[in-house]
Design a protein with these regions (language model features):
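Thiamine diphosphate
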Residues: 7-154
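Short, small-residue-biased leader/transition segments that mark boundaries at the very start
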Residues: 1-3
Length: 154
């Protein structure tokens, strides 16, 4: 997908990487990547969609485990490209369903998500320096802190 998108001629492309060690997961159906968003974990009885991008997907999966132990069933959605997702209305409507509480986890500025849901956990200030793990804790991006914020939203 990165190679395909980097060869676009109709607009800019950025590939954003992390310096942190991240858990990886396998995308079973590569065609789902082309839709801009896909379910990493899907339950028939989910009441919450945890929507994340990039490194936040692993955090969403950890929060899902904690919420499940509290009886809150969640789907986890990866959105590698919001622009592509917006062009796939059926997939967009499946992800941002009115049947679930949709919560976005975004370690960057949350503004681009507010037109899709008011439930956004993001960072609206910058300029901190330090180790990645310490900064994630400082900004509230640990599985436990994210889980507590999600519980307050639902």
């Amino acid at each position: 997908m990165c190679i395909r998108d980097s060869s676009r001629t109709d607009g800019p492309t950025s590939i954003i990487l992390s310096r942190q060690n991240l858990d990886s997961f396998v995308v079973k159906e590569l065609d789902q990547l082309k839709m801009g968003g896909y379910f990493v974990s899907k339950k028939n009885d989910a009441t919450v969609n945890l929507i994340a991008t990039g490194s936040e997907v692993g955090l969403a999966l950890e929060a899902e485990k904690l919420l499940t132990t509290d009886g809150i069933n969640c789907n986890v959605v990866s959105v590698p490209c919001l622009e592509t997702l917006l062009s796939n209305k059926n997939r967009y409507n499946e992800i941002f369903s009115s049947k679930t509480t949709n919560i976005v986890i975004e370690c960057g500025h949350p503004n681009s998500w507010y037109k899709h849901t008011q439930n956004v956990i993001g960072i609206d200030c910058f300029g901190e320096s330090g180790k990645g793990k310490d900064l994630m804790d400082h900004f509230g991006f640990t599985p436990e802190k994210i889980t507590n914020k999600i519980k307050q939203m639902i």
